């Protein structure tokens, strides 16, 4: 399964490059891929980015086969492995990804943060992952990016593109124009050249059904957040792992602190279950997310799916 995922990613990068390539002249007999835009890789549920130490032990992109980012970079591709909340909702992750790319403070939005009773602002990225993204270069060409998401990372990048393209009417209505994040004002859909999703559960995840059938949904969510809260205020926070749950006060901002009392924060985040990746991966949550998302006709879209499920005995569900 891991080998299939690696092969699919390499094929995706090659296909994106060729699809976005300006046609060579008829006299050219040798074809060479041209990569003018960076590739941003976004992990899925319980995943991690290139900045976390666990990635040096087990690269998320590449796993036991080695670091795929290094491999692609050695082939001439400009690649980055972003880090977003492994348990966060598609909305929160899109906000975190935007801030990381731009080098600004994470803004979850006035309306959204009020609806789900958490802080509006998260951490600040003092250096943009992609300098001059969305600006014109010296030749007057817009500096764009390619987005590649695995599993729930695919939902994350689709949400990011939707907000870049259309913005958020709710956030624009709730926020002073002088104070609103550029993510919520729209008009930036052309900042993205392509969107590629790999094994993304666009219409819910099959793992949802056996968990619900066995009555484990609440327990799984509790254990996930309890573990995140412990690790997110330990010496491993911001180094080995990073859960990005400071908006709920459950984890500390690396190097800053600021987490709320543990059990208070744990109750807080569990009281807002619908603002989580676990909810967005349910049939109900996926339907709500999909209603928000549209296709930008000026962006190339690729989606790769694999059938590697096995039937679970007794309940008969494919997982």
Predicted feature locations:
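Sec-dependent signal peptide recognition
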Residues: 4-12
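Hydrophobic core
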Residues: 11-19
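Sec/Tat signal peptide C-region and signal peptidase I cleavage site
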Residues: 22-26
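N-terminal non-catalytic accessory region
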Residues: 27-148, 152-200, 204-219
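Helical cap/lid subdomain of alpha/beta-hydrolase-fold lipid enzymes
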Residues: 162-163, 167-319
